[in-house]
């Protein structure tokens, strides 16, 4: 699937572990996995590390984790101040508005699973030798903060879903349903441009 004309297309996926962010065939796309910022990235504005990975015209980039970590992980773990993360909502909206204004197609997904399904998937990972590498103590620690993350997620969706860059909620307790819904949204959005 290629964007119409020479537009840039970016898809941003954010969600709880293990909501289903990894099941993606990257052929034909630039996939940008996002981990914790390194020393060089920490010395710059938090959006810089994303800006440098934006796709060139006519290409598609998929960000697996995004700058929205600023208002979730960084907020809850104390990696930034309250002023930093509250200001970030407007900074992220302005960033996305600028991208859309330059002709980019922006598609944002919140990949959602409920708490019971997360436990099922965590337990399956823990009990399956070939998948044990996917589960860490940090995953369990973050699960203990479910309610705090729920507040942060709701704030993120409330303050950053805009007419030019709306969030699409993907219910992913059923992985096949989630994949079909995601593909339909991507197709419909690109075809509408």
Mark where each language-model region is.
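Glycine-rich phosphate-binding loop of ATP-dependent small-molecule kinases
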Residues: 1-193
């Amino acid at each position: 699937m290629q964007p119409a004309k020479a537009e840039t297309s970016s898809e941003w996926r954010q969600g709880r572990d293990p909501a289903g962010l990894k099941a993606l065939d990257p052929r034909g796309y630039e996939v940008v996995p996002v981990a914790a910022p390194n020393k060089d990235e920490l010395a710059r504005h938090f959006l810089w590390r994303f800006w440098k990975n934006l796709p060139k015209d006519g290409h598609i980039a998929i960000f697996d984790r995004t700058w929205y970590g600023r208002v979730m992980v960084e907020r809850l773990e104390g990696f930034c101040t309250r002023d930093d993360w509250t200001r970030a909502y407007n900074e992220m909206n302005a960033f996305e508005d600028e991208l859309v204004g330059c002709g980019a197609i922006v598609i944002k997904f919140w990949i959602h699973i409920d708490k019971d399904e997360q436990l099922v998937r965590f337990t399956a990972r823990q009990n399956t030798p070939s998948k044990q590498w996917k589960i860490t103590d940090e995953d369990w620690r973050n699960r203990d903060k479910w309610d705090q993350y729920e507040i942060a997620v709701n704030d993120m969706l409330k303050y950053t879903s805009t007419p030019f860059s709306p969030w699409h909620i993907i219910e992913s307790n059923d992985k096949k349903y989630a994949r079909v819904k995601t593909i339909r949204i991507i197709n419909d959005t690109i075809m509408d441009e």
